[in-house]
């Protein structure tokens, strides 16, 4: 059963990590539906399978990553505000670990996506390639990304919204968001392990860890490629609508008492 749970959670991680729909929210649903008690092993599992998603980004974008130093400098600049803000506010984030915050941010983010797309319907995008992104714009995207520290926001959603507001076309906004995930998720994972080194010692079931990691990697590769093709033809409004629907699903689950807005949120 443990291996089946690992497979399902790996699929959820790969499906939701890079779509602007909140991977945290879907992990809450997934672990609750499966009846998983989030003990020390599963905490380790959820951290380690994120590395599979990171590897997927490197796999898909390796040519762009190794074209030169410029993209790495922009990613460093983009990560800087996220890292600094994270250091200062990390100890205060526990106050936000509440299901009602997830509900609010899911719905709010969905509305923002819809409004931005409607406002940009007839506008020309100014930034149409990664090379055109300035260091100032990369820094601003990092500020937007830091909003993802609020549960339910979605890291990719926050950074994509930032890109759209700065005049990036949809594909460039998504690509830079995916690439910015590399330093962000690696350092966030390393920080989690630094804070709780016992997480690695708890990762003693190699088979489910391997299943989750490989599944997250494969699914994330497919999702990234699909998503980039999708947004080259369509806008983000479907994702906005989905977020709003999911937000109301969570509202019902918390309001009815099916989910506990406090304890079950802390994965």
UniProtKB/Swiss-Prot annotation:
What keywords are assigned to this protein?
Antibiotic resistance, Cell inner membrane, Cell membrane, Cell shape, Cell wall biogenesis/degradation, Hydrolase, Membrane, Peptidoglycan synthesis, Transmembrane, Transmembrane helix
Q: Name one Pfam family in it.
A: BacA
Q: What is its EC number?
A: 3.6.1.27
Q: Name one GO cellular component term.
A: plasma membrane
Q: Which reaction does it catalyse?
A: di-trans,octa-cis-undecaprenyl diphosphate + H2O = di-trans,octa-cis-undecaprenyl phosphate + phosphate + H(+)
Biological process (GO) annotations held by this record are: cell wall organization; peptidoglycan biosynthetic process; regulation of cell shape; response to antibiotic
What InterPro entries does this protein's entry cite?
UppP (IPR003824)
Question: Which family does the similarity line name?
Answer: Belongs to the UppP family.
Additional observations: Bacitracin is thought to be involved in the inhibition of peptidoglycan synthesis by sequestering undecaprenyl diphosphate, thereby reducing the pool of lipid carrier available.
UniProt protein name: Undecaprenyl-diphosphatase
UniProt lists the gene as uppP
């Amino acid at each position: 059963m443990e291996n089946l749970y690992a497979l399902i959670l790996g699929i959820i991680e790969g499906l939701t990590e890079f779509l602007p729909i909140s991977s945290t929210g879907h992990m809450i649903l997934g672990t609750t539906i499966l009846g998983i008690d989030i003990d020390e092993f599963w905490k380790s599992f959820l951290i380690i399978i994120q590395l599979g998603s990171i590897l997927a980004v490197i796999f898909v974008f390796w040519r762009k990553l190794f074209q030169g130093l410029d993209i790495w400098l922009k990613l460093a600049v983009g990560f800087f505000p996220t890292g600094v803000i994270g250091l200062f506010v990390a100890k205060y984030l526990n106050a936000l670990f509440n299901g009602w915050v997830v509900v609010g941010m899911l719905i709010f983010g969905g509305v923002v996506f819809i409004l931005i797309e409607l406002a940009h319907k007839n506008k020309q995008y100014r930034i149409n390639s990664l090379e055109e992104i300035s260091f100032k714009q990369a820094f601003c995207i990092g500020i937007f990304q830091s909003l993802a520290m609020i549960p339910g926001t979605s890291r990719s959603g926050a950074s994509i919204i930032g890109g759209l507001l700065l005049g990036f076309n949809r594909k460039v906004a998504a690509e830079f968001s995916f690439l910015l995930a590399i330093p962000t998720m690696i350092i966030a994972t390393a920080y989690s392990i630094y804070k709780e080194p016992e997480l690695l010692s708890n990762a003693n079931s190699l088979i489910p860890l391997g299943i989750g990691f490989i599944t997250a990697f494969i699914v994330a590769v497919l999702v990234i490629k699909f998503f980039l093709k999708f947004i080259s033809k369509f806008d983000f409004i479907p994702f906005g609508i989905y977020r709003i629907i999911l937000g109301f699903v969570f509202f019902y689950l918390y309001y009815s008492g099916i989910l506990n807005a406090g304890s079950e949120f802390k994965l």
